[in-house]
């Protein structure tokens, strides 16, 4: 019977002519596995990306559209000795919980056997220095074998299965030397017992398995902790929504069945499943994890809502603008996934070292055995020493040194409101010693404020707001928002470059340029009140009013600038805005170095000048308007609105009103880089010390297992320090 495989549900478009799929891969435990999988998949023609994420054992694949069947990737992984299937968050979590429980059972069996075998070994050890009869010693050895052999057969399954799959595929992984070491120790012990020898190694073999299982169990649980942020984000995703299928009829349908333009009902206590705009109702919503706004947002007609937001109080009708994988939540999840799977410079270095290290280890173990035999040692002693070399030199710590830090640091940055858009952004940001800020939309809030709204009569301001709804100009949008306008004036006409007008109760009303409204005489007053203001006029018959609109500084901008100065970071403003506006912002923030009226070319020239002086420049600017200067800087960062997240071009982006993510990201990056270097030195130092000691024969396989597991756990624990909070911004 011919069986076909359809993976179309799991394949998505990653770019023009490029397809993407995520596969879950079983049996990935170390950097050697990662390197082998990536090499094997990259060798397939037309594959443009093959990247393994060790924290969730997922491989991301991209290839030229129309050239490959995704089933070929699964077949190739099977040839390499790994079982693979399309990645789904829920099923991956279930599989990981099942594996964690299995590891715990194996650990329990191994630990129980270890305690009993150790108790049986005590009489043997004491008998070797007293007068124990050979028959008594053999009896204790056979009892130990009766406990250790079945226990090892069960508890060693995680290693034996992985090694068998690798050998069946005519390859090796780091479970192969571990399995060889355990089997050799048990086999030698049985042979020694049969020949009535004084020494057997059942205690060492089963304790070796116990140490290895402790290390693997802790390693898996630490990986789950590092992925906690991504898991929390996935938990925000609602799978169904109440869709209106008639004027007063709703149906609970999967999110995949919802399209833009549909209307859904959002009840109190529910998570929003779509992006859209409220068309009816009033409520408070919590969207802190989506947009960075820590306070509840009042949602009413015209308010945008996003998938993952929690509806707190009222009932809302929402017109859908995006659903499923097109939502802001999905875009944030993709950016976070990219950050977790990214390859930094240090990670590429560690991968290369791990890949070269494995064959060297195997060769070293073989040479050690032969060297000891040539030197006159027995095969027994030589093999024991070789087993110790195989185990102690496993490059697990080296393989975990960088990805664990990057995963933890990415999660810490996400909690600070920062998303990574580049693989080596953390390392480059940590090196930054000079920050250039754009003013408009960066140091200032992206939304405009009507500064003199309180001075305008309420009825006039409401009328101006309703008229502003008929204009597409951002200043008009600010007036409409400030006035709380919801119903536009019927019959309003917009005149390009001038403003908008309409007739109300027989009187003509106008909103726009002062000349359009006949209010030129009032402009001087507004300019004197605030030289930075954008001027908009409103007229109703003979009544004339001036509204002055400006962008306010971000609420914490002054504190953030002070914090950056305290970190010995140079700061300046480069803005294309008018000199009075830039000068006022620089004065308010105590930034002595600023330039106004600069062009994109001027910004690039200034960045290049600083780079020639040896500065590492962080450019913080609008992701769309400052694209050239963002690309020219050593590293770049953009404040970006929810609507424009998918268009982000900077190395890092942040959502929300505060500027604090800039300082928090620098702190996190510097700490992460410090921990990466620390971990590399820990891993390298461990191997430099461990290999000669193991070759010398001083270390038993038992001590080797404890040292190898301990080095990996030490690296993981050190990496978790990247979660700690950044320095307080005051």
UniProtKB/Swiss-Prot annotation:
Keywords: ATP-binding, Cell membrane, Magnesium, Membrane, Metal-binding, Nitrogen fixation, Nucleotide-binding, Phosphoprotein, Translocase, Transmembrane, Transmembrane helix. It is found in: Cell membrane. InterPro entries: ATPase_P-typ_cyto_dom_N, ATPase_P-typ_P_site, ATPase_P-typ_TM_dom_sf, ATPase_P-typ_transduc_dom_A_sf, HAD-like_sf, HAD_sf, Heavy-metal-associated_CS, HMA_dom. Residues 1-101, 163-168, 224-352, 401-676, 721-730 are cytoplasmic. The keyword Iron does not apply. It comes from the Bacteria. Mg(2+) binds at residues 622, 626. The chain crosses the membrane at residues 102-123, 139-162, 169-190, 203-223, 353-375, 383-400, 677-696, 702-720. A metal cation binds at residues 30, 33. Its EC number is 7.2.2.-. The active site is at residue 438. Residues 124-138, 191-202, 376-382, 697-701 are extracellular. The keyword Zinc-finger does not apply. Residues 19-85 form the HMA domain. SUPFAM superfamilies: Calcium ATPase, transduction domain A, Calcium ATPase, transmembrane domain M, HAD-like, HMA, heavy metal-associated domain, Metal cation-transporting ATPase, ATP-binding domain N. It is a multi-pass membrane protein. It catalyses: ATP + H2O = ADP + phosphate + H(+). This is Nitrogen fixation protein FixI. It comes from Bradyrhizobium diazoefficiens (strain JCM 10833 / BCRC 13528 / IAM 13628 / NBRC 14792 / USDA 110). The lineage of its organism: Bacteria, Pseudomonadati, Pseudomonadota, Alphaproteobacteria, Hyphomicrobiales.
């Amino acid at each position: 019977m011919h069986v076909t495989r359809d993976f179309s549900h799991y394949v998505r478009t990653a770019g023009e002519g490029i397809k993407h799929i995520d596969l879950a891969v079983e049996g990935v435990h170390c950097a050697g596995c990662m390197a082998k999988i990536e090499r094997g998949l990259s060798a397939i023609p037309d594959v443009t990306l093959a990247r393994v994420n060790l924290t969730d054992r997922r491989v991301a694949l991209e290839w030229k559209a129309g050239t490959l069947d995704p089933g070929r990737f699964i077949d190739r992984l099977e040839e390499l000795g790994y079982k693979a299937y399309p990645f789904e968050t829920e099923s991956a979590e279930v599989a990981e919980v099942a594996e964690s429980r299995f590891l715990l059972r194996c650990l329990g069996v191994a630990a129980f056997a270890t305690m009993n075998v150790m108790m049986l070994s005590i009489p043997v050890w004491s008998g070797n220095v007293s007068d124990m009869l050979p028959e008594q010693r053999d009896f204790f050895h056979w009892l130990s074998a009766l406990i250790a052999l079945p226990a090892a057969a069960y508890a060693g399954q995680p290693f034996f299965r992985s090694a068998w799959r690798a050998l069946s595929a005519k390859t090796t992984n780091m479970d192969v030397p571990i399995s060889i070491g355990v089997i050799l120790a048990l086999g030698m012990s049985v042979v020694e017992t049969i020949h009535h020898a004084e020494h057997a190694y059942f205690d060492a073999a089963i304790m070796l398995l116990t140490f290895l299982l402790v290390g693997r169990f802790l390693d898996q649980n630490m990986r789950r902790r590092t992925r906690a942020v991504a898991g929390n984000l996935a938990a925000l995703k609602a799978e169904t929504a109440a869709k209106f299928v008639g004027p007063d009829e709703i149906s609970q349908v999967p999110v995949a069945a919802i399209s833009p333009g549909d209307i859904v009902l959002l009840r109190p206590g529910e998570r929003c499943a779509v992006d859209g705009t409220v068309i009816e109702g009033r409520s408070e919503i919590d969207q802190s994890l989506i947009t960075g706004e820590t306070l509840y947002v009042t949602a009413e007609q015209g308010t945008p809502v996003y998938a993952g937001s929690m509806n707190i109080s009222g009932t809302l009708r929402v017109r859908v603008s995006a659903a499923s994988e097109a939502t802001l939540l999905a875009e944030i999840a993709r950016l976070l996934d990219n950050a977790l799977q990214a390859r930094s410079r240090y990670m590429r270095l560690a991968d290369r070292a791990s890949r070269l290290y494995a064959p060297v280890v195997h060769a070293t173990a073989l040479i050690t055995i032969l060297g000891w035999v040539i030197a006159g040692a027995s095969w027994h002693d030589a093999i024991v020493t070789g087993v110790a070399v195989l185990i102690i030199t496993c490059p697990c710590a080296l393989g975990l040194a960088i990805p664990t830090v990057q995963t933890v640091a990415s999660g810490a940055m996400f909690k600070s409101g920062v998303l990574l858009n580049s693989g080596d952004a953390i390392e480059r940001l940590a090196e930054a010693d000079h920050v250039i800020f754009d003013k408009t939309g960066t140091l200032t809030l992206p939304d405009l404020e009507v500064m003199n709204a309180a001075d305008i009569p309420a009825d006039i301001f409401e009328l101006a707001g309703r008229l502003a709804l008929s204009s597409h100009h951002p200043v008009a949008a600010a007036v409409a928002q400030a006035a709380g306008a919801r119903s536009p004036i019927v019959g309003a006409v917009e005149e390009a470059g001038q403003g908008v007008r309409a007739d109300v109760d027989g009187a003509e009303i106008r909103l726009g340029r002062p000349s359009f409204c006949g209010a030129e005489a009032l402009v001087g007053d507004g300019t004197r009140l605030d030289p930075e203001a954008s001027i908009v006029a409103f007229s109703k018959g003979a009544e004339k009013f001036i509204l002055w609109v400006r962008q306010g500084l971000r609420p914490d901008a002054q504190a953030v600038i002070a914090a950056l100065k305290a970190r010995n970071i140079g700061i300046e403003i480069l803005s294309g805005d008018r000199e009075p506006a830039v000068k006022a912002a620089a004065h308010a923030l105590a930034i002595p170095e600023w330039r106004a009226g600069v062009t994109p070319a001027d910004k690039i020239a200034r960045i290049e000048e600083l780079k020639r002086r040896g500065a590492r420049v962080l450019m913080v600017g609008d992701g769309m308007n400052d694209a050239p200067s963002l690309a020219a800087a050593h590293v770049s960062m953009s404040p970006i609105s929810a609507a424009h997240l998918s268009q982000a071009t900077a190395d890092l982006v942040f959502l929300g009103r505060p500027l604090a993510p800039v300082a928090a990201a620098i702190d996190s990056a510097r700490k992460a880089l410090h921990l990466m270097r620390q971990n590399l030195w820990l891993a390298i130092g461990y191997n430099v010390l461990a290999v000669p000691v193991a070759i010398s024969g001083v270390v038993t396989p038992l001590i080797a297992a404890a040292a190898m597991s301990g080095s990996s756990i030490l690296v993981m624990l050190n990496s978790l320090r990247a979660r700690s909070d950044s320095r307080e911004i005051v």
